């Protein structure tokens, strides 16, 4: 039955899945010139399907990190930004992750389950543990469990940092509809700064 509410009602806890965190790149790309908008619209994109507080906050902060990487932030600058954003989080576990707790953990301390904070931590761990796209992607997906989603979450930030040329050409060429994907990305890039959000 319709409630008239534009967003789903939050449930939270371990039912807070990672689905909205894996598909932020287009939003972050569209608003990469406006960090606050990138964060806000990334968070809003989660509310439609994954309204738990930790999902919404994780999407907001990750969208902002992706946007910063697109705009040229270094790895170190991304770590500093994440730590700064941790102060705005209401979820203490998310704040701990953003402060870099994953950077001192070993493989056996990382969970790659479907829970949004586990997946975020796993993706950031793979990102911090390697210095090129391929190695990090392999590390992320070989954690097991929800491997494809963790790989996608990793790939958004790593792709933004390393750029198109940092992704192995033979991987790009083997994607289904590579041309369509690149055309869509180019279309978003060409329109940065022109997107208008219509509510209602």
Task: Annotate each predicted stretch with a short phrase.
Residues 160-200:
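Conserved glycine-rich phosphate/nucleotide-binding loop
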Residues 1-130, 136-143, 157:
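Amphipathic alpha-helical interface segments
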Residues 151-162:
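Short, small-residue alpha-helix embedded
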Residues 32-38, 132-135, 162-175:
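Phosphate-handling active-site elements
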Residues 148:
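Conserved catalytic/binding loops enriched for acidic/polar residues
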